[in-house]
């Protein structure tokens, strides 16, 4: 059958993406075909579009169908698939999602509860699973924990603030403007630092009685990473989970020595590779989403053909909620 897909034939800016009609084979054994209903737009997509193949973003042959996650309805099943049936609502973390239809291994699907809408799942599945392992497994936050989150008003920042507060942690967020500060305050943050007008190192130390944060979640990268080392507590952890401002360059490992700082550069792929862990992570996420325990604001909705504009908006850093594409 034919499917429409947003592809790149060369790496570059948003303008390199184009809507193509391509052939999609019938689902192979163990696979299903999904009619995508809502597609998440994430920074991983920008890294792929630009050709940044560091870390988990391995190089692919061109042309590339864009995208790393979506939700939809199973349209066809391949041989030996017994876990899912036609008509079931599912989400997935996987390639080629900027398309009207996608084939995926049945073993990598997440069944969506009725209480979680397609838009919420599309906006929060990847971000939510990332937040789950960052807050509940990589570093277990809870009462007595002080966490600092960079880009607190962004899509990841909002769910980290909400879920961190739910777990009992004290949440400090950094933002670039007073408008974003207001957004972050409404989503679980106990203190907000506007780094455009104040020194976030000094302010973090002030907020923590000079001790530093227990854990710092950095999705910014180049602009924030080294400064984060100066405001984490001794034996604390700096988690570099994203590089929105550019990759972190080489740095002297001795900078970690005086405070025994732990630095990690994790990827979601490693934390949901085990099926049992993936199932437990999705259950935890869907419990907080469907139970109304956290707010789930949504940003702009773009038609699939306007994927380039969605990328421009995400890269503008003006976004304070997840962006999705609607096929």
Residue ranges and their predicted role:
Residues 23-41, 53-96:
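Glycine-rich beta-strand-centered segment in the early N-terminal region that forms part
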Residues 63, 68-69, 76, 89-153:
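NAD(P)H dinucleotide-binding glycine-rich loop of Rossmann-like/cofactor-binding domains
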Residues 89, 146, 170, 236-237, ...:
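Short glycine-centered segments of the SAM/dcSAM-binding site in methyltransferase folds
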Residues 124-197:
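Mid-domain Rossmann-like dinucleotide-binding core that forms the NAD(H)/NADP(H) cofactor-binding site
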Residues 200-210:
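Short amphipathic alpha-helix with an adjacent loop that forms part of the alpha/beta core around
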